Swiss-Prot record:
Residue positions binding D-serine: 222, 277, 304
Sorted UniProt keywords: Cell wall, Cytoplasm, FAD, Flavoprotein, Oxidoreductase, Secreted
Binding residues for D-proline: 222, 277, 304
EC number, UniProt record: 1.4.3.3
Activity vs pH: Optimum pH is 7.5-10.
Gene name for this UniProt entry: dao
Disulfide bonds: none
Protein's job: Catalyzes the oxidative deamination of D-amino acids with broad substrate specificity.
Regulation: Inhibited by benzoate and phenylmethylsulfonyl fluoride (PMSF). Weakly inhibited by anthranilate, crotonate, and the amino acid-modifying agents dithionitrobenzoic acid and diethyl pyrocarbonate. Not inhibited by malonate, meso-tartrate, D-malate, or the amino acid-modifying agents iodoacetic acid or butane-2,3-dione.
Protein name: D-amino-acid oxidase
Temperature dependence: Optimum temperature is 65 degrees Celsius.
Length: 326
């Protein structure tokens, strides 16, 4: 298609409208692409909408590239946190260590306000912990902000299911594949697998700091306060495809979280959700050519770090798309 003064505008189709897809679509639009997002469900029904969304690298590899993408995303979020309309804020929290020796985490240089926990700050059973400041995104507001920003810049969202990347890219100059766990089918990638995460939202009893307790012997545990609620988690069930919340799992999550934070006992439950994190041995962010010759940038396999890596990966994906057409 043509833009002002007859300039040819490259057409990009982004597959997927979770945080990876919307961020990539915005990055493409800011590079001058005409952008159309194609997705099977609206943003509020994606895995991203289920996320507790603390900046924290989780189940994403390799570490060196994850650190680079994550640091860039942290930088962008720091700017977004200045605008309350984005749903992003900088929050203080703690990661608890029960098995690991409290050395230096590999992601330390990406965060601010880092320090080791003092002994009196630790709950029973913990060998150590870290306090740090990190972005927290309230995903309903943040996804709405991203979609509004994309549409305000001239991008569009089309809700329909596609059976292949070739179908999605009909009429486009480049495809950007941000299909999450569904890349197993669309990209014909058997290395992609679901990591099921279940959470519940409860009324916030006055909590301000997030708590991450990955090594809890009773199961993965995290508490993420937001403006009007708390997200309590969670699970990391590899290979399980169900997005139906399990009542027994919800009870166990609430029990673990209440043991860490007694103020959660009796908290009013607002919602149960489950989503499928896109697991993969490594994040796939690379260019390939689809049958028929259309270039395709793959951007998936972020594990539990979709929000954490979103802008770093989006900008690199947009750069790859630009290079493919140059």
């Amino acid at each position: 298609m043509c833009g002002m003064r007859g300039r040819v505008v490259a057409r990009a189709v982004v597959v997927g409208c979770g945080v990876a897809g919307l961020s990539a679509a915005i990055a493409l639009r800011e590079r001058g692409f005409g952008v159309r997002v194609v997705a099977r469900e609206p943003p509020e029904r994606t895995t991203s909408a289920v996320a507790a969304a603390v900046w924290y690298p989780y189940r994403a590899y390799p570490e060196e590239r994850v650190l680079s993408w994550g640091a860039r995303t942290f930088e962008v979020f720091r700017g977004l946190a200045a605008d309350p309309r984005t749903g992003v804020r900088l929050g203080e929290g703690v990661e608890l260590l029960r098995r690991s020796a409290p050395g230096e985490p590999w992601w330390r240089e990406a965060v601010s306000g880092f320090r080791r926990c003092r002994e009196e700050e630790l709950p029973p059973g913990c060998r150590g912990g870290y306090r740090f400041v990190a972005p927290v995104a309230e995903m309903p507001a943040y996804l709405a902000y991203l979609l509004d920003r994309l549409r305000g810049a001239g991008g569009t969202l089309e809700l329909r299911e596609v059976s292949s990347l070739e179908e999605a890219g009909e009429g486009a100059d480049v495809v950007v594949n941000c299909s999450g766990v569904w890349a197993r089918e669309l990209a014909r990638d058997p290395s992609v697998f679901p990591i099921r995460g279940q959470i519940l939202r409860v009324a916030n009893p006055g909590l301000e700091r997030f708590v991450l307790d990955e090594e809890n012997p009773a199961g993965l545990t995290y508490i993420v306060p937001r403006s009007g609620d708390c997200v309590l988690g969670g699970t990391a069930e590899e290979g399980r495809w169900s997005t139906e919340p399990d009542p027994a799992t919800a009870e166990a999550i609430l029990r673990r979280c209440s043991a860490l934070e007694p103020r959660l006992r009796g908290a009013r439950v607002l919602e149960h959700r489950a989503g499928l994190r896109p697991g993969r041995p490594e994040v796939r962010l690379e260019l390939e050519e689809l049958p028929g010759g259309t270039p395709c940038v793959h951007n998936y396999g972020h594990g539990g770090s979709g929000v954490t890596l979103s802008w770093g990966c989006a900008e690199e994906a947009a750069a790859l798309a630009g290079a493919a057409l140059s």
